[in-house]
Regions:
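Extracytoplasmic/secreted envelope proteins and their assembly/folding machinery
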Residues: 7-10, 19, 31, 75-82, ...
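Substrate-binding/active-site groove segments that recognize
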Residues: 47, 120-121
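Secreted peptidase-domain scaffold signal
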Residues: 124-132
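Catalytic-core segments of hydrolase enzymes
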Residues: 1-59, 102-106
Length: 132
């Protein structure tokens, strides 16, 4: 979450190869101010995809609902959906699942270093994966 710092770039571990890096958008689908941007030091597009991370409803240890923000909220949202996708398509490997997620993104036709491949459409990813 370096987006509000002078160095706004994705860094470790989000800049690693062969992983799915998730940025955060707000309720309007706009890049959240705290969400890091790309490219990586070697010029790769990052983040890979985006999900809502601001505001996010959370439940604390006492069961109280509050709102917070961060890629720490957008990433588990995508991770859970990726797990469901992989469960539905068990014949796919990790690289194929990541590619399906990227290809289903709202920005897949023109990925950039702010939104990456955009907000993934997991229904689309499932159908694409099921057809291949």
């Amino acid at each position: 979450n370096d987006g509000m710092r002078s160095w706004k770039r994705i860094n470790f571990p989000g800049d690693a190869r062969d992983i799915l890096t998730v940025g955060a958008v707000d309720a309007n689908g706009e890049n959240a101010s705290f969400s890091s941007i790309g490219p990586t030091a070697d010029g790769r597009i990052k983040p890979d995809v985006m999900a809502q991370g601001s505001p996010t409803a959370v439940i604390d240890g006492r069961g109280n609902i509050s709102h917070d923000m961060g890629t720490s909220f957008s990433t588990p949202l995508v991770a859970g959906l990726v797990a469901c996708l992989w469960q539905a398509l068990p014949e796919k490997n990790a690289f194929q699942i990541i590619q399906l997620v990227k290809d289903s993104g709202s920005n897949a036709s023109n990925p950039d270093n702010i939104y990456g491949y955009g907000i993934p459409d997991f229904w689309k990813a499932y159908h694409e994966g099921n057809a291949k």
